[in-house]
Amino acid sequence: GCSHNLCVSITGIKDQFALEGEKLTQEYAALALGTAFHPYFVGSTFDPEAVGIEKQMLRKALEDEVNDKRLYCQRQANREFFGDSPAGVRQEGYLEEVDGLTPEALTEAYYEMLRTANIELIVLGCDEASTTAVKDALLTELSAIDRAPLPRAENIAMPRREPVRKVEHFDTTQAKLCMLFTLGR
């Protein structure tokens, strides 16, 4: 859709159950915030070797998607229906875009995300002091960034247009049909 989510999540035991009274919540927060705000760079960009590995995995996942005919049909229909609108942009991107991913481009996108993202903090199962400490740690990280969060995307309806029919042929015994409709005027 128009908004994509990146979730950094940590689950662990409460401080009160730590064997030696450790402040586990602080450690969880440090780990999550370190992951989000201090990724591993080689020089000033993401590690080229790691990017190469991730590109291979992404390529494989996108190529394998065609084996799940229902999902493939739905995603192809969304791509056709929404076109270039923000709702048509897939979180994973598209197979033809994988080769263009570079450590530099990904690093630039990462910094843009930090600058413009709407950020929500959810802390569950902690006392008020621990929750406040986590919030303060996040605010400290954010204070080092020149932020300009974008407004949240409004719900959109695609404009009415002539029906489009797209057919792809596969060597299968079962067909899939996906139909999308709009309330757009």
PLM region spans:
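His/Glu-based metal-binding/catalytic segments typifying zinc-dependent metallopeptidases
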Residues: 118, 147-185
